[in-house]
Amino acid sequence: MDRRDGYIMNEIMLRAENIERTYHAGSVDVPALKNCTLEFGQGEFTAIIGKSGSGKSTLLRILGSVDEPDTGSVIIAGKKITGMKDKELSEFRRRNIGYIYQDYSLFPEFTAYENVVMPILIDGKKPDENEVDDLLEELGISHCKNK
């Protein structure tokens, strides 16, 4: 059993096996990923770096279940997500995957408060007002709560 920074590193949290993804631009096939296999253990931090067009965003969309590979499989916390039905995948994604886009995606017509509680409401839960206020304070945006 390997220990790093207080984490027990014996459990594979994410595994991608033989991922391939090709985009089709008219009569031209553009391979983005070819035979990509990787795994990440619990508590690991990983940077994915490469030149523009090297497949980083494609890989992250597939690992985050936003896109499907042409071939291969993705397993998160022991559950194979490739090939899941839409409803099951949506539920799994909502409960287990956090995906942050390069450009922030706030709803401009909503207040800061409404943007913060949106995921809680989508999950069918009632937001804890004190927790939301604490979060807004921690983020330094409590003055924007109703803006």
What are these regions (language model features)?
Residues 72-80:
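Conserved ABC transporter NBD signature motif
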Residues 64:
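Helix-to-loop junction immediately C-terminal to a conserved catalytic motif
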Residues 110-119:
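Short coil-to-helix segment of the ABC ATPase nucleotide-binding domain corresponding to the Q-loop/switch region
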Residues 49-51:
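The feature captures the beta-strand-to-loop junction immediately N-terminal to the Walker
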Residues 27-30, 81-98:
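ABC ATPase NBD coupling module
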